[in-house]
């Protein structure tokens, strides 16, 4: 039982494969065969959309305006910051010359925010793409929201489509029209023209909006020299095998295919440094073929490319050559989540799947061969008048591309990981990342995910990234201070790893056996001898495959409470599972009841040292199911009026001293200047016939040695009677830096030497001036104080003794004598709301008048506490 929430419904309706050859575009394959019918191979979802009715409308809405979609280059780096160059924005209309009405049966489950739709024949359809913008919801028929575009009278691709159109006319003249030659009530020739854009859409986000359906793809065109990948500019080691699971997951801004328009990359090869790529690649598959490149495969790659000479590629007599393919995903997202859902599936599924196909097309002409194979099977089925189910069973069994599209649709629709094998050398895994944690408790109008891990541990903080804010996405690379929590039984995970085989299997099995949720990656590296980079790569692999989660290492001095977001509906089932795992220990209700009391370190629940490992196993089990969460303390520096007044007094004294020093050094000079001025004035008055008035000049009579406090560091709007919070000590202003310096200056000197080996009370006998520069950067309200001992490699007892001296309120202070001069922390504990059938407790800490730092302790990361005077 794990606390990972399934991704939202991807709203996937169908997947379409369109190819274009010299003869024209072809509607090759779509899955499922009847997307909006419960009679198809795949039943319609039970909570998809309102039922559809038959429609006789010959109008359709346009898609969104030209700024509604975003276009990206092929080069991305999910591990590092993505910097895709903006491409040009364009809007074009495609014809939809169809006159028959469409009717279909839809799923029977409405979803809030969805519109009912009459999906019919389209007259006007807008294809839009905007590299920098977000998609907006396309308007429905007659809604007035969509930008209605003029229907194009002539087909720009008329010459290319002539051959295909004539072939279709022969088919239509026959008495039998196969059901697989239409989709959503429209004939195949409509979709061929609509979803076959011009070359300007090469490797850009292609989006068509028809009623409330969105058609999104990433078209790929052949290069002008007839190849699918740009030749190398620099002589590098050839790479002929698939090395990265999902292309794009491994790429960096400097890497790419270098294909024609829209590409910034000048070379075909990725960076020679494969360290980062190996980490990303490991998250995709355990196939050993991804880990090495054989000489025969390299030779095959070179021979394939050398075979495709320019003369052969551009041979005008060769009519059987593919020039474009486009895998189009048909989506039906909710109205209010249109942009978000399209962005998720485009970035994580559409683009990466198309890149994988492009790779194989460049290597072995894969897409074109499979398209011809599928078309051949369909022609035979048409002659035999096979049923749709029989045809699709044969296609999926005989065509690897049809099987791959089927796998992607089935897995992504079920919010699972799609593991696709295009060939023995190329495999890819695709998924929409699931929700693993949340830093917020849901509000009354928010969608709740009961059982989801409630924490801020995986959020980017100012210590991690000084330029980050609270809305920054979590880090992509696992930090060395994290630990790994398996989301399933270790034995079952090891069994799956060993059964999967592959080059990573032995390393994964060894790491899983060495890993403990109480030890960080860095500690495991030291104890096991596994390099830290390898551990991070293996941990990323397990996290990607939803078999583990990165957490702060479990420790007995940390405080854990019952999560306010725990799923009580699963309590009965969880109790039985807990009893089976820990039959001789306190039951699950008893453990939750004990942990729902006054928050205290987890070590206080452990009866003896012999039970330590067992109770940590219990804690890991509770965290895995989202039953408990860590109570973390956060702090901000509070500057009292006394500190402000002391700093202001010092600043004014500095101004006075500066004034006096200038005046003393200039006194002799002023006397000489006065004598010279008197003599020159008398002589000039004798020889002048003017009025004797001097020309007024700005600042002429202002002496340099006059006392001027206009440049004081003190902001005139700052009140000296109220306290202030320093939000970001690492970016403190000059005045805030003076305040922090004054706080440190007021700490008493060293209280006494600590005997060698006596670390029991080291934190109580050490001068705070020694640790203040280290601790101050964590007092920003975003970094938990529990990070300090882990990140700074300090003993936890030492850290918490220092924090208690600073004013952090804990339950262990009764026997400790605190110096009032060191009490610069003001602590506040939020109400700890526990599960309903146990109890609700609250702890209110003292509010010392001399406090300077506020430290709220909570689980959801919100610092909504204002200190009082």
Curated annotation (Swiss-Prot):
One Pfam family of this chain: HTH_NPRL3
Keyword Amino-acid biosynthesis annotated: no
Signal peptide region: 1-23
Compositional bias of kind Acidic residues: 254-271
Compositional bias (Low complexity): 57-70, 80-102, 679-692
Sequence ranges of Basic residues compositional bias: 45-55, 229-239
Region (Disordered): 31-180, 228-275, 662-702, 842-869
One GO term (biological process): TORC1 signaling
Alphabetic keyword roster: Meiosis, Signal
UniProt key word Signal: yes
GO cellular component, as recorded: GATOR1 complex
Biased amino acid composition, Polar residues: 115-129, 842-853
The family this protein is said to belong to: Belongs to the NPR3 family.
Function: Mediates inactivation of the TORC1 complex in response to amino acid starvation. Required for meiotic nuclear division.
UniProt name for this protein: Nitrogen permease regulator 3
Natural source organism: Aspergillus niger (strain ATCC MYA-4892 / CBS 513.88 / FGSC A1513)
């Amino acid at each position: 039982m794990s606390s990972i929430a399934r991704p939202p419904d991807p709203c996937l309706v169908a997947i379409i494969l369109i190819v274009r050859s010299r003869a024209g575009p072809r509607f090759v394959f779509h899955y499922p065969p009847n997307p909006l019918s419960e009679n198809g191979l795949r039943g319609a979802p039970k909570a998809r959309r309102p039922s559809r009715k038959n429609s006789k409308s010959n109008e359709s809405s346009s898609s969104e305006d030209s700024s509604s979609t975003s276009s990206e280059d092929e080069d991305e780096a999910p591990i590092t910051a993505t910097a895709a160059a903006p491409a040009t924005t364009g809007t074009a209309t495609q014809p939809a010359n169809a006159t028959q009405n469409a009717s279909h049966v839809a799923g029977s489950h409405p979803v809030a925010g969805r519109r009912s739709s009459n999906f019919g024949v389209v007259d006007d359809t807008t294809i839009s793409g905007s590299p920098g913008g977000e998609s907006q919801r396309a308007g429905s028929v007659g809604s007035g929201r969509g930008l209605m575009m003029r229907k194009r009278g002539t087909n720009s691709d008329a010459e290319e489509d002539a051959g295909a159109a004539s072939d279709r006319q022969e088919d239509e003249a026959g008495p039998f029209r196969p059901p697989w030659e239409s989709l959503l009530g429209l004939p195949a020739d409509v979709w061929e023209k609509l979803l076959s854009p011009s070359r300007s859409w090469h490797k850009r986000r292609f989006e068509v909006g028809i009623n409330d359906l969105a058609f999104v793809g990433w078209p790929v065109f052949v290069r002008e020299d007839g190849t699918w990948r740009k030749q190398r500019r620099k002589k590098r080691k050839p790479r002929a095998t698939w090395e990265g699971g999902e292309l794009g997951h491994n790429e960096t801004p400097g890497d790419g295919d270098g294909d024609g328009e829209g590409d910034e990359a000048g070379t075909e090869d990725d960076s020679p440094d494969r360290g980062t790529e190996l980490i990303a690649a490991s998250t995709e598959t355990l196939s050993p073929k991804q880990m090495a490149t054989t000489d025969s495969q390299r030779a095959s790659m070179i021979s394939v490319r050398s075979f495709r000479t320019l003369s052969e590629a551009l041979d005008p007599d060769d009519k059987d050559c593919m020039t474009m393919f486009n895998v189009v995903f048909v989506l039906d997202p909710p109205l209010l989540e249109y942009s978000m859902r399209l962005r998720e599936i485009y970035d994580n599924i559409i683009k990466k799947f198309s890149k994988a196909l492009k790779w194989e097309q460049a290597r072995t002409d894969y897409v074109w061969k499979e398209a011809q194979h599928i078309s051949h099977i369909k022609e035979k089925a048409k002659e035999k008048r096979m049923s749709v189910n029989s045809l699709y069973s044969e296609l999926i069994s005989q065509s690897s591309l049809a099987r791959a599209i089927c796998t992607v649709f089935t897995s992504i629709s079920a919010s699972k990981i799609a593991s696709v094998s295009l060939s023995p050398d190329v495999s890819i895994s695709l998924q929409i990342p699931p929700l693993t944690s949340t830093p917020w408790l849901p509000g009354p109008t928010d969608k709740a995910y009961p059982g989801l891990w409630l924490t801020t541990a995986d959020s980017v903080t100012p210590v991690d990234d000084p330029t980050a804010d609270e809305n920054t996405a979590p880090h992509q690379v696992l930090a060395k201070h994290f630990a790994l929590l398996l989301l399933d039984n270790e034995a079952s995970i090891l069994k799956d790893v060993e059964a999967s085989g592959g080059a990573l299997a032995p390393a994964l099995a060894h790491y899983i056996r060495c890993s403990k949720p109480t030890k960080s990656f860095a500690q495991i590296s030291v104890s096991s001898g596994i390099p830290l980079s390898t551990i991070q790569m293996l941990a990323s692999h397990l996290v990607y495959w939803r078999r583990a989660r990165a957490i702060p290492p479990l420790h007995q001095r940390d405080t854990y409470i019952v999560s306010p977001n725990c799923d009580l509906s699963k309590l009965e089932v969880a109790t039985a599972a807990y009893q089976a795992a820990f039959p001789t220990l306190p039951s699950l209700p008893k453990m939750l009841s004990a942990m729902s009391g006054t928050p205290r370190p987890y070590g206080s629940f452990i009866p003896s040292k012999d039970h330590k490992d067992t109770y940590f196993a219990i804690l890991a089990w509770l965290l895995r199911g989202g039953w408990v969460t860590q109570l973390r303390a956060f702090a901000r520096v509070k500057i009292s009026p006394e500190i402000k007044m002391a700093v202001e007094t010092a600043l004014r004294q500095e101004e006075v001293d500066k004034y006096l020093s200038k005046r003393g050094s200039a006194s002799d000079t002023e006397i000489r200047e006065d004598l010279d001025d008197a003599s020159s004035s008398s002589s000039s008055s004798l020889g002048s016939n003017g009025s004797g008035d001097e020309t007024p000049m700005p600042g002429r009579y202002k002496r340099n040695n006059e006392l001027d406090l206009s440049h004081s560091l003190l902001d005139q709007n700052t009140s000296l009677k109220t306290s202030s919070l320093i939000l970001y000590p690492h970016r403190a202003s000059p005045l805030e830096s003076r305040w922090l310096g004054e706080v440190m200056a007021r700490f008493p000197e060293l209280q006494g030497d600590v005997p060698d080996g006596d670390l029991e009370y080291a934190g109580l006998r050490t001068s705070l001036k020694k640790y203040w520069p280290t601790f101050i950067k964590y007092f920003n309200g975003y970094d938990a104080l529990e990070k300090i001992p882990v990140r700074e490699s300090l003993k936890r007892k030492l850290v918490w003794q220092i924090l208690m001296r600073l004013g952090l309120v804990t339950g262990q202070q009764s026997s400790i004598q605190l110096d009032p001069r060191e009490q610069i922390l003001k602590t506040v504990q939020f109400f700890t709301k526990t599960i309903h059938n146990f109890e609700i407790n609250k702890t209110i800490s003292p509010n010392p008048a001399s406090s300077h730092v506020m430290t709220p302790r909570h689980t959801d990361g919100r610092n909504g506490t204002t200190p009082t005077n």
